[in-house]
From Swiss-Prot:
Described purpose of this protein according to its UniProt entry: Catalyzes the NADPH-dependent reduction of L-glutamate 5-phosphate into L-glutamate 5-semialdehyde and phosphate. The product spontaneously undergoes cyclization to form 1-pyrroline-5-carboxylate.
One GO term (biological process): L-proline biosynthetic process
Gene Ontology cellular component terms for the protein in this record: cytoplasm
Oxidoreductase keyword on record: yes
Source organism of this protein record: Methylococcus capsulatus (strain ATCC 33009 / NCIMB 11132 / Bath)
Protein's name according to its UniProt entry: Gamma-glutamyl phosphate reductase
InterPro entries documented for this protein: Ald_DH/histidinol_DH, Ald_DH_C, Ald_DH_N, Aldehyde_DH_dom, G-glutamylP_reductase_CS, Glu-5-SA_DH, GPR_dom
Keyword terms: Amino-acid biosynthesis, Cytoplasm, NADP, Oxidoreductase, Proline biosynthesis
Domain of life: Bacteria
Family under the similarity heading: Belongs to the gamma-glutamyl phosphate reductase family.
Record field: catalytic activity: L-glutamate 5-semialdehyde + phosphate + NADP(+) = L-glutamyl 5-phosphate + NADPH + H(+)
Coiled coil: none
Length: 430
């Protein structure tokens, strides 16, 4: 560790000075990283992967300290599961870094180069954002994943993980630094905030002189705090209230398959369906069968009055159910008159993450694509496909429901920006 990152300060002023030092160093190193060759970045990524594998036993031992402390603090089973690191998860981190190394490097890519009437050529070059601050909870694998994406996209990064994972994150960060040095890049290209003092988050959010973008990954309370306090632009999504609308022009077999997969393939993820909308004309044919399938999988249905009429064991929905991201085997179900009401419901209650229509009607599909204002809009496909890997982006640092700077899954390209380049041969403006 550097002298700066080895400090574990106490008190708000000391914490602010510590984080300011990390941010200043990140800005310096970011300039070096922005001009690093692709081969050097890939060497470092592969070296980090190897360091993680070589240190697997040590990582698991450090993680054991976090798990013991978490259990003593009363973390529940799901929280401890997210916190855990075993041999398989170490291998997954290493594989992920190798996959990032294999991805095309977006930095330096030139597009749209055209001649202007004056004779100059004008185009755009893709360049790193600069310094990225990443604030996250629980999952230690984010330390490796985020570092890998920032490195490949030419960005320096400052990582602030949850206090419950501090031992795990320190151990992973040590492997990252070792790999960076082995690859011939500055170890401070990736810096971990090692204090668990909550004031460090506020200090990072105020470091707008050095940090270009903030990416929060965690629960709603964390993201709301980041958005409220940050002086720096934020890439984020608050909720994943994803909808599937079964149109009365849907193929019933497709509708059943998509509705079951979108909800039950994995519950605790932001691209799982939370509300099912069904056109009134097809509801009697599809809802009773779907309800039986959900019942077999242990999913609780909370429905509108018409849903409860068609599915007698359905729990009556409250208004709050339409605005809830359950991340659990609970599904809100509403029967709507048709496409107009479905789109209106999504506009009123959706989170702008991912919404899908099941229909064989081309016109309705086109209208749904055009009018639903979400980061991902789908036709005849499960919302679970809203993922950087599935979109061909490789790994992702998160999903953005904002419209600026990035929208949808944020991969390597989303961690870059573009600048104009102009090529001339002694041209002057007349």
């Amino acid at each position: 560790m550097t002298a700066v990152s080895a400090l574990r300060p106490a008190g708000p002023e000391a914490v602010a000075a510590y984080v300011d030092g990390l941010a200043r160093r990140a800005r310096e190193v970011g300039r070096i990283l922005s001009r690093a060759e692709t081969a050097a970045k890939n060497r470092a990524l592969l070296a980090i992967a190897a360091a993680l594998e070589e240190s697997a036993d040590a990582l698991i031992e450090e993680n054991r300290k976090d798990l013991e402390a978490g259990a003593a603090k009363g973390l529940d089973r799901a929280q401890l599961e997210r916190l855990g690191v075993d041999a398989k998860r170490v291998q997954t981190m290493a594989v992920g870094l190798r996959e990032i190394a294999a991805l095309p490097d977006p930095v330096g890519e030139i597009s749209g180069l055209t001649y202007r009437p004056s004779g100059i050529q004008v185009g755009r070059m893709r360049v790193p954002l600069g310094v990225i601050g990443i604030i996250y909870e629980s999952r230690p694998n984010v330390t490796a994943d985020a570092a890998g994406l920032c490195l490949k996209s030419g960005n320096a990064c400052i990582l602030r993980g949850g206090s419950e994972a501090i031992h795990s994150n320190r151990a992973i960060a040590a492997c990252i630094r070792r790999g960076l040095e082995a690859g011939g890049l500055p170890a401070d290209a990736v810096q971990l905030i090692e204090t668990t003092d909550r004031a460090a988050v506020g200090a990072l959010l105020a470091a707008d002189e050095y940090v270009d973008i903030i990416v929060p990954r965690g629960g709603r309370s964390l993201i709301e705090r980041v958005v409220a306090e940050s002086r720096i632009p934020v890439i984020k999504h608050l909720d994943g209230i994803c909808h599937v609308y079964i149109d009365d022009g849907a193929d019933l077999a497709k509708a059943r398959r998509i509705a079951i997969n979108a909800k039950t393939q994995r519950y605790g993820v932001c691209n799982a369906m939370e509300t099912l909308l069904v056109a009134a004309g097809i509801a009697p044919a599809v809802l009773p069968d779907l309800a039986a399938l959900y019942r077999d999988k242990g999913v609780e249905l909370r429905g509108c009055p018409e849903t409860c009429r068609l599915v007698p064991d359905c729990v009556p929905a409250t208004e709050a159910d339409w605005d809830t991201e359950y991340l659990a085997p609970i599904l809100a179900v509403r029967v709507v008159a048709g496409l107009d009401e479905a789109i209106e419901h999504i506009h009123r209650h959706g989170s702008g993450h991912t919404d899908a229509i099941v229909t064989e009607d081309y016109g309705r599909a086109r209208r749904f694509l055009r009018e639903v204002d979400s980061a991902s809009v789908m036709v005849n496909a499960s919302t679970r496909f809203a993922d950087g890997f599935e979109y061909g982006l490789g790994a992702e640092i998160g999903i953005s429901t904002d419209k600026l700077h990035a929208r949808g899954p944020v991969g390597l390209e989303g961690l870059t920006t573009q600048k104009f380049i102009v090529l001339g041969d002694g041209h002057v403006r007349i």
